[in-house]
């Protein structure tokens, strides 16, 4: 009787862990980066180096994370015109061949 109770406990534990892994597969192996606050003002383009779009459904809001030349990360609203323009310019800059 003790063996079957232990086996049942082991099976329930395994089943519970399996559903957690299946329900949230990206939380197991990939860390999630979210923005909880957005910058109010415009960041000059000359200070920007790159960007990353945050569209993860587990984050409270969509955002763009700009990496500055000073190696800082700043969250911005992707709906703002200056953010969209900066992303376009950074895309063009990254596609321009360097001599």
Curated annotation (Swiss-Prot):
GO terms for molecular function: CCR chemokine receptor binding; chemokine activity; heparin binding. Gene3D superfamilies: 2.40.50.40. GO terms for cellular component: extracellular space. CDD domains: Chemokine_CC (cd00272). The keyword Secreted applies. Coiled coil: none annotated. The keyword Transferase does not apply. Disulfide bonds join 34-59, 35-75. Residues 1-23 form the signal peptide. One of its GO terms (biological process) is positive regulation of cell migration. Keywords: Chemotaxis, Cytokine, Disulfide bond, Heparin-binding, Inflammatory response, Pyrrolidone carboxylic acid, Secreted, Signal. It is found in: Secreted. InterPro entries: Chemokine_b/g/d, Chemokine_CC_CS, Chemokine_IL8-like_dom, Interleukin_8-like_sf. SUPFAM superfamilies: Interleukin 8-like chemokines (SSF54117). The modification Pyrrolidone carboxylic acid is found at residue 24. It comes from the Eukaryota. Its main location: secreted. Chemotactic factor that attracts monocytes. This protein can bind heparin. Belongs to the intercrine beta (chemokine CC) family. Monomer or homodimer; in equilibrium. PANTHER family: C-C MOTIF CHEMOKINE 8 (PTHR12015:SF209), SMALL INDUCIBLE CYTOKINE A (PTHR12015). This is C-C motif chemokine 8.
């Amino acid at each position: 009787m003790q063996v079957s109770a232990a086996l049942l406990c082991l099976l329930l534990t395994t089943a519970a862990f399996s559903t957690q892994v299946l329900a949230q597969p990206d939380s197991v192996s990939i860390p999630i980066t979210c923005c909880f606050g957005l910058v109010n003002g415009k960041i000059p383009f000359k200070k920007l180096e790159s960007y990353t779009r945050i569209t993860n459904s587990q984050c409270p809001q969509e955002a763009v994370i700009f990496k500055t030349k000073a190696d800082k990360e700043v969250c911005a609203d992707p709906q703002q015109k200056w953010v969209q323009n900066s992303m376009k310019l950074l895309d063009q800059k990254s596609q321009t061949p360097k001599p």
